[in-house]
């Protein structure tokens, strides 16, 4: 599916431009044009990505973030129950993309699943956090080089805990770009 190759492409470009930082940058609030907002390190730039409603990239830190919206109405139109839990939705995504692992709650109560992929220039680890509002499921995926991932896991959980979703549909649905 398009997400796999897009994740690989975005992360490969990021990994090639990664530089080590001596200390963590300041936290700032990002308000995306979709209405989604989150707090994370300064230095991220908005990034358009086909098949996603948006994203961010920080080349200095080697981190990319992609945001996807899947409307409940679109799920219902293809016979999938939009009333499923976040855990069920996570398993649905993992099945769709052939990913192995488990859907879990992190130490801060965020629902997520984690997976690794080989990309040009190395291995990447993906932390996919799951949300829902009144009209859609949302997936916000934080990506980094696998060898940096353990050191970023807590940071990603903290950032994920700050996410606020838009109240209306954005309009871009996974697989319908």
Regions found by a protein language model. Give the residues of each.
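N-terminal "mature-domain start" segment
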Residues: 23-50
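Stable alpha-helical elements in mature extracytoplasmic
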Residues: 40, 85, 89, 152-159
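Structured segments of extracytoplasmic/periplasmic soluble domains
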Residues: 43, 47, 92, 96, ...
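Conserved polar/disulfide-associated segments of primarily extracytoplasmic proteins
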Residues: 50-139
């Amino acid at each position: 599916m398009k997400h796999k190759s897009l994740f690989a492409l975005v992360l490969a470009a990021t990994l090639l431009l990664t530089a080590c930082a001596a200390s963590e940058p300041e936290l700032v609030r990002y308000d995306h044009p979709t209405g989604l907002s989150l707090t994370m390190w300064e230095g991220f730039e908005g990034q358009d990505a086909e098949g996603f409603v948006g994203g961010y990239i920080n080349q200095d830190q080697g981190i990319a973030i992609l945001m996807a919206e899947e409307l409940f109405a679109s799920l219902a139109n293809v016979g999938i129950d939009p009333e499923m839990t976040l855990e069920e939705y996570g398993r649905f995504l993992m099945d769709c993309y052939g990913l192995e692992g488990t859907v879990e709650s992190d130490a801060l109560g965020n629902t997520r699943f984690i997976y690794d992929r080989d990309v040009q220039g190395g291995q990447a680890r993906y932390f996919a956090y799951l949300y829902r509002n009144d009209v859609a499921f949302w997936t916000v995926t934080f990506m980094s080089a696998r060898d940096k991932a353990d050191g970023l896991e807590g940071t990603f959980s903290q950032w994920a805990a700050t996410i606020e979703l838009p109240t209306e549909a954005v309009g871009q649905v996974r697989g319908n770009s």
